[in-house]
């Protein structure tokens, strides 16, 4: 008898709609691969009852808080249910851009200069030291909540007088916010599947940066896979991504986003331990380039679950 698989989708985070699309695609792909899979939306179903409902494994197609941040992973561990993707600690660290950057920096890996602020600091009013640190980043900067995905709450700031509004928006989504030096690009993403690093993808958004609309709604965003890098550059990028991935303790599958600045240096942006699996999504695109169908990809991800 085959295992009964729960595909967790939807949820309650800011990325619910993306997750519903990801989950529907994953469900179809698993069923095409002969897997006995069923959709489960934690917003509507008590996921603490998954075991009593007869499920033996879980495919996590949730994005953002409550699905990608270690909390769900911890619950599944306590229940003794194998699940896809990274464990508790790696999921929590990857969801937290600030702590990811601190770990990467500590490991000697390249990250863009940044300033971190708490909501309390912002509401109190920034002191001269903080203002000087922000000023040292130059303009433009990118302002982002530390623990949101899909570019939710993110803004590019090109003029000093726009910074307050950008911070206000970011603080609507998190207690901690990053102000990062703007890197001119292009942006790359590299997917990891088990021990295999898939071909890199170069991302060319129509707008100024790769925001929520460019990721999920726009047909004008262009993706290049293979990315067009020279062999040595591709090898260097893959080596950097592998170090970034293992530094956070990630496993199973996921994605690391990287920027190539005008100085020819790669800089790590963030790790995604439960990436999108929609029609616009990048892991399926990289897998396709590596000769793997969508169904083969999701079945392989499930096989890696522990």
Swiss-Prot record:
PROSITE patterns tied to this protein: ATP_GRASP, DALA_DALA_LIGASE_1, DALA_DALA_LIGASE_2
Binding site for Mg(2+) 2: 270, 272
Broad enzyme group: ligase
Signal peptide annotation: none
Location within or outside the cell: Cytoplasm
Catalytic activity field: 2 D-alanine + ATP = D-alanyl-D-alanine + ADP + phosphate + H(+)
Gene3D superfamilies for the chain: 3.40.50.20, ATP-grasp fold, A domain, ATP-grasp fold, B domain
Top-level taxon of origin: Bacteria
Annotated residues for binding of Mg(2+) 1: 257, 270
Pfam families given in the database record: Dala_Dala_lig_C (PF07478), Dala_Dala_lig_N (PF01820)
Gene Ontology biological process terms, A to Z: cell wall organization; peptidoglycan biosynthetic process; regulation of cell shape
UniProt protein name: D-alanine--D-alanine ligase B
UniProt organism field: Escherichia coli O6:H1 (strain CFT073 / ATCC 700928 / UPEC)
Gene: ddlB
